[in-house]
């Protein structure tokens, strides 16, 4: 068997509770090694410019539509063309924000998209999962919901 070129920081399950401290919320994230980028549910996305900087405002929810909305405003990091799992291509806004997963802390890039018809409000893709090992047979290794 080939050895890993690095020592993994942690083993995570196929679903994990993650905290977005700047947003003041904890969400259940689906771990998706097939997705390159991570995504966060966002509604009512608006872009504005202030003192030469672009800002993005949006509403997100820690669960389904029945959970209270979180209003958030942050710097717009980028705008990227993303291909969804069904092959549909769309432009999405990208933000950078700290993320906590158990004792791990990292900066992640999140694309903003409407995930209200999805089971999980957040998807963690390969870029956020660098140096982590995924155990697909288990869930919530870093804390129960």
Where are these regions (language model features)?
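Pepsin/retropepsin-fold aspartyl endopeptidases
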Residues: 1-145
């Amino acid at each position: 068997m080939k050895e890993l070129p690095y020592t993994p920081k942690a083993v995570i399950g196929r679903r994990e509770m993650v905290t977005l401290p700047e947003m003041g919320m904890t969400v259940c994230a689906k771990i998706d090694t097939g997705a390159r980028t991570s995504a966060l549910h966002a509604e009512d996305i608006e872009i504005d410019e202030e003192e030469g900087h672009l800002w993005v405002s949006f509403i997100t929810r820690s669960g389904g539509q029945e959970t209270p909305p979180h209003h958030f405003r942050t710097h717009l990091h980028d705008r990227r063309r993303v291909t969804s799992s069904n092959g549909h291509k769309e432009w999405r806004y990208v933000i950078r924000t700290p993320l906590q997963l158990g004792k791990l802390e990292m900066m992640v890039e999140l694309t903003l998209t409407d995930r209200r018809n999805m089971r999980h409000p957040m998807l963690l893709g390969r870029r956020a999962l660098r140096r982590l090992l995924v155990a697909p047979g288990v869930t919530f290794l870093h804390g129960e919901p």
